[in-house]
Amino acid sequence: IIALDATISSRPKGQKLDEFFHEIKEKYPDQLLMADCSTIEEALHADELGFDFIGTTMVGYTEQSKDLKIDENDFEILRTILSKVKHPVIAEGNINTPAKLKRVLELGAFCAVVGSAITRPQLITKSFANAIK
C-alpha cells in the first residue's frame, strides 16, 4: 500500500490530486493506494476517486483541520467518514493509546496505524511524566 497526500494542499508543479491519482492508476493499475486525508470532504473526494483505502492520517495536521482532533466527541470525524465512504478506512494520526486503538476498531475502522507512540517513545514518556507533575 502506498499512501498519498489527499489533502487540498498544493502539490509540486500545481498538479491536482485527481490527475496524480489517475496517472498512477494508469501506469500501475494493481497498486493499492491509501488517501491521507485531513477532513471529511477530502475523504469523500478520495473515496469518489477510487482510492483503495481512506486514511485519517492528516486530521489535525493541516491548515484546514488544525482545530480537529481525531478522538474528539468519541471519534466523530472517523465515525462520519466511516458512514459516508465505501472503501475501507484506516484510522491513523494520534492513535496513541490502547484505548484509542480499541475504540477505532470497535467503530469499524479496517485497521489502525500506531505510529509515533511506538516510533517516538520520548513522546509517550513525556505524556506519562506530564500526567504526574
Regions picked out by a protein language model, each given a short descriptive name:
Residues 2, 46-57:
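Conserved long hydrophobic alpha-helices within structured protein cores
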Residues 38-50, 85-86, 91, 95-112:
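Catalytic cores of alpha/beta
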Residues 25-35, 82-92:
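Short beta-strand/loop segments at the ligand-binding rim of alpha/beta enzyme cores
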Residues 2-3, 34, 55, 113:
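Conserved beta-strand positions in the central sheet of alpha/beta enzyme cores
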Residues 6-27, 40-45, 62-82, 98-102, ...:
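Active-site-adjacent beta->alpha loops and helix N-cap segments on the catalytic face
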Residues 1-8, 31:
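Short intrinsically disordered, low-complexity coil segments enriched in acidic
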Residues 6, 37, 58-59, 93-94, ...:
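Short secondary-structure boundary segments
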